[in-house]
């Protein structure tokens, strides 16, 4: 449970919007009856968008948790632009129906927060990571590993909220930010991290384990690291091999039956 923000079910960022929508809906209902329906629809949408439920948090010290709800759009070896080192990059896209509260993926200490102005292209696109407005949190885990998690604004999301700063200690699952109306989070982990998700997977904030990160730098072989990332990024390769083998067996059986 977040020691600074005890999960009031509805995110505090939505209180003014929901309160205003509820008051306006009631007022129009009293004056105009069914004409208030659009206002009630808006209020219900705001309630679902700003929901912020408490969740059970995995305590495995090697687990790097998903900071948000959403869909995996990137799993690849890439360059961490904030540390200028090779990293395992995992990106999560959030649509307007996901929970948009951001939580810390691990027990860590924030070493730096970097804000970049930018555009507001569709957060589902790869170029959003480098062109959109974004806010990066650089942190060191309790075991000394360096990780980076980046809030990226989207086509509709025009406001990034970050409540942490250099020197702050974050507990896994602790709330540190919020982005409104569709956005993206990029994670940069050490190259020896083992991805536990693949492109297209749906993830749940703080419940889904994105990767397993050894507590110490294992100095894994770069070739095996690249192969691990490639397997995660292309989950259908093994399935394709199985299907090809099955097709060959089926063809052989048909030949036997014809004879």
From Swiss-Prot:
PTM info: Is synthesized initially as an inactive proenzyme. Formation of the active enzyme involves a self-maturation process in which the active site pyruvoyl group is generated from an internal serine residue via an autocatalytic post-translational modification. Two non-identical subunits are generated from the proenzyme in this reaction, and the pyruvate is formed at the N-terminus of the alpha chain, which is derived from the carboxyl end of the proenzyme.
One Gene Ontology cellular component: plasma membrane
Membrane topology: Peripheral membrane protein
EC id: 4.1.1.65
Active site, per annotation: 183
InterPro entries registered for this protein in UniProt: PS_Dcarbxylase (IPR003817), PSD-A (IPR033175)
Broad class of enzyme this protein falls into: lyase
Cofactor: pyruvate
Reactions catalysed: a 1,2-diacyl-sn-glycero-3-phospho-L-serine + H(+) = a 1,2-diacyl-sn-glycero-3-phosphoethanolamine + CO2
Chief location of this protein within or outside the cell: membrane
UniProt pathway annotation: Phospholipid metabolism; phosphatidylethanolamine biosynthesis; phosphatidylethanolamine from CDP-diacylglycerol: step 2/2
UniProt remark on cofactor binding: Binds 1 pyruvoyl group covalently per subunit.
Keyword Lipid metabolism appears in the UniProt entry: yes
Site residues by UniProt (Cleavage (non-hydrolytic)): 182-183
Pyruvic acid (Ser) modification, residue list: 183
GO molecular function per UniProt: phosphatidylserine decarboxylase activity
One GO-annotated biological process of the protein: phosphatidylethanolamine biosynthetic process
NCBIfam families xref list: AS_decarb, PRK05305.1-2, PRK05305.1-5
Cited function: Catalyzes the formation of phosphatidylethanolamine (PtdEtn) from phosphatidylserine (PtdSer).
Assembly with partners or alone: Heterodimer of a large membrane-associated beta subunit and a small pyruvoyl-containing alpha subunit.
Protein name: Phosphatidylserine decarboxylase proenzyme
Annotated source species: Neisseria gonorrhoeae (strain ATCC 700825 / FA 1090)
């Amino acid at each position: 449970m977040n020691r600074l923000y005890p999960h009031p079910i509805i995110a505090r960022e939505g209180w003014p919007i929901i309160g205003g929508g509820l008051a306006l809906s009631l007022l129009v209902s009293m004056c105009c009856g069914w004409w208030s329906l659009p206002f009630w629809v808006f209020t219900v949408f705001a309630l679902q968008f700003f929901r912020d439920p408490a969740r059970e948090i995995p305590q495995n010290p090697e687990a790097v948790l998903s900071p948000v709800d959403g869909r995996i759009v990137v799993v690849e070896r890439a360059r961490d632009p904030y540390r200028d080192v090779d990293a395992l990059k995992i990106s999560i896209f959030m649509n307007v129906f996901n929970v948009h509260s951001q939580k810390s993926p691990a027990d860590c200490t924030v070493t730096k927060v970097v804000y970049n102005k930018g555009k507001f292209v569709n957060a589902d696109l790869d170029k959003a990571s480098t062109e959109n407005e974004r806010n990066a949190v650089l942190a060191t885990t309790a075991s000394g590993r360096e990780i980076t998690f980046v809030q990226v604004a989207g086509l509709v999301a025009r406001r990034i909220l970050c409540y942490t700063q250099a020197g702050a200690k974050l507990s896994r699952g602790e709330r540190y930010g919020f982005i409104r109306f569709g956005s993206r989070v990029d994670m940069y982990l050490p190259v020896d991290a083992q991805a536990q998700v693949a492109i297209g997977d749906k993830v749940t904030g703080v419940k889904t384990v994105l990767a397993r990160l050894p507590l110490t730098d294992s100095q894994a072989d770069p070739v095996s690291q690249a192969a691990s990332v490639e397997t995660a990024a292309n989950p259908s390769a093994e399935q394709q091999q199985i299907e090809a083998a099955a097709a060959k067996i089926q063809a052989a059986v048909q030949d036997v039956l014809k004879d």
